[in-house]
Amino acid sequence: MLRSAPLALGLEPHPLNNSLAFPVFYHIHCYCPSPLLLSLLLHYTVLFSPFGARNHKLYIYIYIYIYIYIYMCINVCTYMNAGPRGVCSLCVYVCTHFNIYIHTYIYLLFVY
């Protein structure tokens, strides 16, 4: 009962040292988002951002980064025989770092 309590609270083992970490940026099953979904998200931020189209180079870099991430995430999960929604530690690690970057980017975009 007590051993399952952290999981009930939303805590997961950290992929590197197996300690519990609060998954603020973790996917539940390490989803690999589709390019269409991410493209729609970025087009939305371009259309409604306070910066407008002035920083179009920034958006191009973000696009490139996202597609590299998708390629890496799908290949890693397939290589680990976990499938695109598998819970392999390396895939979770990649997804976690991507989530930190994209959430930070969106936060900075709408705050500054």
From Swiss-Prot:
Organism domain of life: Eukaryota
Coiled-coil segments on the chain, per record: none
Membrane-topology annotation of the record: Multi-pass membrane protein
Entry's localization field: Membrane
GO cellular component, one term: membrane
TM regions (residue ranges): 33-53, 58-78, 91-111
Keywords: Membrane, Transmembrane, Transmembrane helix
Note: Completely overlaps YIL100W.
Protein name: Putative uncharacterized protein YIL100C-A
